[in-house]
């Protein structure tokens, strides 16, 4: 349905993305190739399974906030003008009838959020007062993971659909952090195998030698 009123459009978008199915990023072909998940189900599931869920969206100097309980709208504030930067604030409390004695594993969550900012340089995330930000993407990730200076400055390559950061250290063995569509692929995959093969082949071709 074509929404003519701009305020209704803003309001409906906030409601749709947080509570209605089939409104995820995968319905935009330009975003689909770089996103992970299933049709935006995640935020809807959190909303439906929370006794308190509050979403506040700030975009293009307009602000909209809505409060839900178990996926149903409880209250909402009218669209207002805002001087804040574009972004989204989400607060929620899981439904104790569903989860009982739940607890958050902060270390796990913070690792996920840290990866998100490395993969989306310039993105700022505030989680319970802890701020996560990366200006240089995977270069910052590799710099943080290294326990000692590398043998040479980190090589950082970034294209439209690929980003690579690589260096060598003094430790024995190899360590990789690979990602696809914003998801940390802890078990590797064909993307990692292809990179390793191309890397070794390039060195062989450059020096015109074969290495085992």
What are these regions (language model features)?
Residues 17:
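Short basic (Lys/Arg) and small-residue
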Residues 107, 114-116, 122-212:
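GHKL/Histidine-kinase-like ATPase module
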Residues 21-29, 203-210:
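Structural motif corresponding to the C-terminal cap of alpha-helices
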Residues 22-23, 95, 169-173:
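Short connector loops/turns at beta-strand edges and beta->alpha or beta->beta junctions
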Residues 1-13, 24-144:
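GHKL-type ATPase core
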């Amino acid at each position: 349905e074509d929404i003519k009123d701009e305020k209704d459009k803003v309001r409906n978008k906030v409601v749709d993305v947080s509570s209605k199915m089939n409104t995820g990023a995968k319905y935009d072909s330009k975003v689909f190739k770089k996103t992970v998940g299933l049709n935006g189900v995640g935020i809807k599931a959190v909303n439906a399974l929370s006794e308190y869920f509050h979403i506040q969206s700030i975009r293009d100097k307009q602000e909209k906030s809505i409060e839900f309980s178990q996926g149903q709208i409880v209250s909402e504030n009218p669209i207002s003008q805002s001087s804040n930067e574009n972004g989204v604030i989400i607060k929620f409390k899981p439904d104790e009838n569903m989860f009982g004695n739940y607890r958050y594993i902060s270390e796990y969550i913070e690792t996920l959020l840290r990866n998100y900012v490395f993969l989306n340089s310039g993105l700022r995330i505030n989680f319970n007062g802890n701020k996560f930000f990366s200006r240089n993407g995977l270069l910052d990730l590799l710099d943080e993971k290294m326990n000692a200076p590398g043998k040479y400055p980190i090589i950082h390559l970034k294209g439209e659909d690929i980003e690579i950061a690589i260096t060598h250290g003094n430790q024995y063995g190899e360590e990789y952090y690979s990602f696809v569509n914003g998801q940390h692929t802890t078990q590797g995959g064909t993307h990692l195998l292809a990179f390793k093969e191309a890397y070794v082949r390039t060195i062989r071709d450059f020096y015109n030698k074969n290495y085992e």
